[in-house]
């Protein structure tokens, strides 16, 4: 059963990927895959062009059954700006439903145009509260890693590159 679906979201320049799924752990909490990849470039195993399960997708372009939205309580109000979509997807996955990225439709998105950047002390404080709230709600996946992401790949970049050799332990598979 597919519950949440998201498409390829391109940045305002119309030629590069802005959102193509979310990996828990990118940037410490969660981040988007393939940021800045040009639409003509190949991605890691061409994943940017393949439908696939992810732990989360962006709400910039998300579809979900209303019944599931109601069952999980919708978006968490304590996550007013950041991580509310990721938290929602995590709640959906907890029900045993799938979160799927499908690159068949493309949306052009002007990220942060309406709300702006975290460029004031108040916005930075809100963002830090939302990081703490998300971390408190989902400590296990933050500790154990994203089940849809190979632990031998880096969490510092969104390009699926190998981790630093010093940090690679025995493969989990």
Feature roles, as predicted:
Residues 140, 146-156, 163-172:
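Boundary detector for helix-to-coil junctions that initiate low-complexity/charged tails
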Residues 1-9, 171-173:
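Single conserved hydrophobic/aromatic residue that forms the stacking wall/gate
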Residues 57, 81-87:
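Acidic donor-binding loop at a coil-to-helix junction in glycosyltransferase catalytic cores
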Residues 98:
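Residue-level detector of anion-binding/catalytic polar loops
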Residues 6-72, 95, 106-118, 122-128, ...:
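Acidic/His-rich active-site region of diverse nucleotide-sugar glycosyltransferases
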Residues 129-130, 136-143:
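Catalytic cores of secreted or luminal carbohydrate-active enzymes
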């Amino acid at each position: 059963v597919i519950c949440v679906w998201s498409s390829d979201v391109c940045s305002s320049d119309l030629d590069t990927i802005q959102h193509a799924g979310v990996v828990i752990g990118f940037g410490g909490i969660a981040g988007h895959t393939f940021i800045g990849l040009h639409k003509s470039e190949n991605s890691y195993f061409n994943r940017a062009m393949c439908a696939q399960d992810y732990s989360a997708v962006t709400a910039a372009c998300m579809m979900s059954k209303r019944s599931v939205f109601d069952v999980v309580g919708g978006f968490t109000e304590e996550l007013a700006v950041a991580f509310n979509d990721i938290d929602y997807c995590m709640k959906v996955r907890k029900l045993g439903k799938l979160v799927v990225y499908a690159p068949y439709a493309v949306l052009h998105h002007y990220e942060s145009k309406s709300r702006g950047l975290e460029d004031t002390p108040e916005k930075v404080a809100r963002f830090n509260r939302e990081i703490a709230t998300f971390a408190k709600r989902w400590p296990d996946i933050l500790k154990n890693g994203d089940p849809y992401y190979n632990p031998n790949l880096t969490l510092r970049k969104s390009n699926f590159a190998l981790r630093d050799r010093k940090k690679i332990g025995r493969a989990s598979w």
